[in-house]
């Protein structure tokens, strides 16, 4: 699910002040073979 992908990305990025939506999206696209739906990008 998207929730699990986002959670894994946040934990992996380990950014001190939180992870931006762009950073999360980039991490997920680089580490998983999926294509985002337009609604996810909002």
UniProtKB/Swiss-Prot annotation:
GO terms for biological process: nucleosome assembly. Pfam families: Linker_histone. It is found in: Nucleus; Chromosome. InterPro entries: Histone_H1/H5_H15, WH-like_DNA-bd_sf, WH_DNA-bd_sf. Keywords: Chromosome, DNA-binding, Nucleus. GO terms for molecular function: DNA binding. Belongs to the histone H1/H5 family. This is Histone H1B.
